[in-house]
Amino acid sequence: MVTAIVLIDVEADRIPEAAQQIADLPGVDQVYSCAGDVDLVAITRVADHEAIAELVPGHISKVPGVLRTVTHIAFREYSQRDEDDAFSIGMQS
């Protein structure tokens, strides 16, 4: 499984529609609109690098209003849930 974080610049008047279209794409797990340097952040989870190579330029970049994407590939996931699981070994709930 490959997780990628895709930063997306979108024409201002098309952000809601673009966000929904991107969210509906297979492999896109979450889409956030945000303040800052980019308009949308998409969290993607796909089978392999070939799939992310298809998803971003082949689908996300072609959504009407999308101007630019920057993709970051995740190496490892660190989350509170992982920490909680690690420290609860042998403890009863």
Role assignments for model-derived ranges:
Residues 1-93:
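A compositional/biophysical signature of low hydrophobicity enriched in polar/charged and small residues
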